[in-house]
Swiss-Prot record:
Its EC number is 2.7.7.27. It comes from Clostridium perfringens (strain 13 / Type A). Involved in the biosynthesis of ADP-glucose, a building block required for the elongation reactions to produce glycogen. Catalyzes the reaction between ATP and alpha-D-glucose 1-phosphate (G1P) to produce pyrophosphate and ADP-Glc. It comes from the Bacteria. InterPro entries: ADP-Glc_PPase, ADP_Glu_pyroP_CS, GlgC_bac, GlmU/GlgC-like_hexapep, NTP_transferase_dom, Nucleotide-diphossugar_trans, Trimer_LpxA-like_sf. This is Glucose-1-phosphate adenylyltransferase.
Length: 393
């Protein structure tokens, strides 16, 4: 065994959090995708970390790579998620120089391969692989229970998607007993609607063997979906699908990030952030109570600590420290922390990055496409219309 055994654990979670998030454009110019703010007071990484803590999994590795500073600062020692533990806890795992050289993480499987030594310190029976950029709540302990009952070598969480969307996902074709007989990566003509969520439980000793073999394969993309899962199926390993029926969103695009924030404003919020039985925790700065001015009007919106609102806010999400000036109208928008919206501004269907300033009289968005303003950007000019910052349909 490589390294020193610290303490034997039944399961270790590994969160893949090094993604650049290029489809989020200017929002990830200076930070990793899992560190992008979400839902008024969270960052995306809070969801897998909270799920781990709520599931009783207290040994977690977070694999970082692209622009990790904000992400590292946010996670800290893990106390927000009860992961500040001497016996396990949370560990930040960037790529590093080893005796035989080093390299960036080349794929999801390679990222885990490069951290075999970390996993071996805990000699686990199972390893849980998670994406750091999905919004959902899941009890991983129930998934592990099914993995054991089925005596599986690997269990993959799947969610039912509409048939017309299935070609966008990795699709698991299963038998009646949920055993997987075929995996198709973004098939042109899908045979089922069981989409992989990128959540895996593996028997560690079996996964380690496949990771080591995959690393020697020069033609491999070193990816779980493209390489490891198909190779396990072809070798006759027992793979099981774990159906998930709750809310799940891959917020890897401007459109999906905006939609996920808007979903929180529905009367019956599927994600249910108010559920006291399964809380989503986040490291938040101490802010004064929000202030609502005498002429302010707020409808169907989330506003949090430190907000000052003098204008009109409708169907929008305002993060900490947002200022909305007199006569300003904010509609169908996501306004990230510490952004200042001056008097008589009109914002409609937009995402405004952190610490931006939208100057007096500006107009952003036309209500059709999603407009995006980068963090710390200053939008100036009386009645200037900003429409081409980062549009999606």
């Amino acid at each position: 065994m490589e390294g020193r055994l610290v303490s034997k654990k039944e399961i270790v979670a590994m969160i893949l959090a090094g993604g650049q998030g290029s489809r989020l454009g200017v929002l990830t110019k200076n930070l990793a995708k899992p560190a992008v703010p979400f839902g008024g007071k969270y960052r995306i990484i809070d969801f897998p970390l909270s799920n781990c803590s709520n599931s009783g999994i207290y040994t977690v590795g977070v694999l970082t790579q692209y622009k990790p500073l904000k992400l590292n600062e946010h996670i800290g020692i893990g106390d927000t998620w009860d992961l500040d533990r001497r016996d396990g806890g949370v560990s930040i795992l960037p790529p590093y120089q080893k005796e035989k050289g080093g390299d960036w993480y080349k794929g999801t499987a390679n990222a885990i391969y490069q951290n075999i030594e970390f996993i071996e310190r805990y000699d686990p029976e199972y390893v849980l692989i998670l994406s750091g950029d999905h919004i959902y709540k899941m009890d991983y302990d129930k998934m592990l229970e099914m993995h054991k009952q089925k005596e599986a070598d690997a269990t993959i969480a799947v969610i039912n998607v509409p048939m017309h969307e299935a070609s966008r996902f990795g699709i698991m074709n299963t038998n009646e007993d949920l055993s997987i007989y075929e995996f198709e990566e973004k098939p042109e003509h899908p045979k089922s609607t069981n989409a992989s969520m990128g959540i895996y439980i593996f028997n560690w000793k079996i996964l380690k063997k496949f990771l080591e073999e995959d690393e020697l394969d020069q033609s491999s993309s070193n990816d779980f979906g493209k390489n490891i899962i198909p190779k396990m199926l072809n070798s006759g390993k027992k793979l099981i699908a774990y159906p998930f029926n709750g809310y799940w969103k891959d917020v890897g695009t401007i459109e999906s990030l905006w939609e996920a924030n808007m979903d929180l404003l529905k009367y019956e919020d599927e994600l249910s952030l108010y559920d006291s039985e399964w809380k989503i925790y986040s490291a938040n700065p101490v802010r004064p109570a929000q202030f609502i001015g005498k002429d302010a009007e707020i409808k169907s919106s989330l506003t949090v600590e430190g907000c000052i609102v003098h204008g009109k806010v409708e169907n929008s999400v305002l993060f900490q420290g947002v200022y909305v000036g007199k006569g300003a109208i904010v509609k169908d928008a996501v306004i990230m922390p510490n952004t200042k919206i001056e008097d008589n501004v009109l914002i409609e269907k937009a995402i405004i990055g952190s610490e931006a300033i939208v100057c007096k009289g500006c107009k952003i968005g036309d209500g059709n496409k999603i407009s995006v303003i980068a963090s710390k950007e200053v939008v100036i000019g009386s009645k200037e219309v900003i429409e081409e910052c980062a549009m999606v349909k």
